Regions:
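Phosphate-binding site of ATP-dependent enzymes
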Residues: 171-265, 288-293
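Short glycine-enriched, charge-decorated loop/helix-capping segments at active-site entrances
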Residues: 22-28, 163-168, 310-312
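ATP-dependent carboxylate activation and anion-phosphoryl transfer catalytic cores
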Residues: 120-125, 254-340
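ATP-binding N-terminal substructure of ATP-dependent carboxylate-amine bond-forming enzymes
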Residues: 1-101, 106, 111-112, 116, ...
Length: 340
């Protein structure tokens, strides 16, 4: 394999710092653990990685445009603290005709717009929970949803805006939650049928012939009594809390062959329906009656060596450096003379 200069692109914004003087650039800080892990894996694979940082300023975009790399490993999830702009960053790279890993601007936009993604799933015959989209003063695509429901921002990811209070069992709770979403996120609210069941994640690798990785389950059974079994903000981000500490991912051993096949086929179908590239993760709910529901598609899953995606890849026989190297190879193959 040719030794490549690969820019590991990540986002960082001034709001993560203490208050800064007007007109000054954000302070430097070490990259997050997943960014550092990808950097080290690329180095181990014989490449020459360099860090590229987007901090929400025009200057950082100019620096990115002038950076000299053979490929950009795109780990950006936001721009200037706005996580709805990851597709704009991909679009910027596309306009610069830069080669980069992962899904392009179109696929990122489709996955970000949860209501649009669900309509695409329905068109392709992929089962997803019933839903309605509520704008200020207007409801769109209202299906016959019954309580309990879960209410979330229509265009956020990473469980942002999804707390335990997002699960509503009455009209009063529902209206309060819709008002919260409108006020806090200036976003339409997505009301979705709440599916009680197991939380399963299926990673997908590939482009022309995508491969579904073994399913990983997030164990929500040990959440404190009275809390809904959802992977909300408390579970994903609030380190040190009981909810965070008691939810662990593992490789389930009790999924029968038919279910594994259905998970794999549906994951690949959803991956392709939203035009994902190279890698991605499909989030499912498995109901008690065996029904499988696609909750959402994550085109840029957390790539830390200990996270769910790498866990599934390891089960499929790939070391972490091999996984990172395969993502590089998949990206290069999408471009003319990709390996040169």
């Amino acid at each position: 394999m040719a030794r490549l200069r690969i820019g590991v692109l990540y986002d960082y914004w001034w709001g993560e710092d203490e208050e800064r003087a007007e007109g000054t650039r954000p302070k430097r800080k070490p990259p997050d653990e997943d960014v550092q892990a990808v950097y080290e894996a690329l180095k181990e694979s014989g490449h020459s990685p360099v860090f590229l940082r987007l901090d929400g300023t025009r200057e950082s975009l100019v620096e990115l445009a002038h950076s000299e790399t053979d490929l950009i490993f795109n780990l950006v999830e936001s721009f200037g603290g706005d996580d709805t702009q990851d597709s704009d960053v991909a679009g910027f790279l596309e306009m610069l005709h830069r080669r980069f890993t992962g899904t392009g601007s179109q696929g990122l936009h489709l996955a970000q717009d949860k209501a649009l993604a669900k309509k695409i799933f329905a068109f392709h015959g992929i089962h997803t929970p019933y839903f309605a989209t509520v704008f200020r003063g207007r409801t769109e695509h209202a299906q016959d949803i019954q309580f309990p429901v879960i209410v979330k921002p229509a265009a956020e990811d990473g469980s942002i805006g999804i707390h335990f209070g997002a699960v509503c069992t009455s009209i009063k709770e529902l209206m309060e939650r819709i008002d919260y979403i409108h006020a806090e996120f200036n976003s339409p609210a997505l009301i979705e049928e709440y599916i009680e069941g197991r939380e399963l994640y299926v990673g997908v690798l590939g482009n022309e012939k995508p491969e579904a990785l073994p399913a990983v389950e997030l164990d929500l059974s040990k959440l404190p009594q009275g809390m809904p079994k959802i992977a909300g903000t408390e579970v994903k981000w609030e380190e040190g809390t009981e909810a965070y500490e008691k939810t662990k991912a593992f490789l389930p051993a009790d999924l029968d062959e038919d279910l594994q096949k259905k998970l794999s086929e549906t994951a690949v179908q959803a991956f392709q329906a939203l035009k994902l590239c190279d890698y991605g993760r499909i989030d499912f709910r498995l109901a008690a009656d065996g029904a499988l529901h696609v909750l959402e598609v994550n085109p840029n899953p957390y790539l830390h060596a200990d996270a769910e995606f790498a866990m599934a890849a390891k089960k499929a026989g790939r070391s972490y450096p091999e996984l990172v190297g395969e993502i590089v190879d998949l990206a290069l193959a999408r471009y003319p003379n990709g390996g040169s």
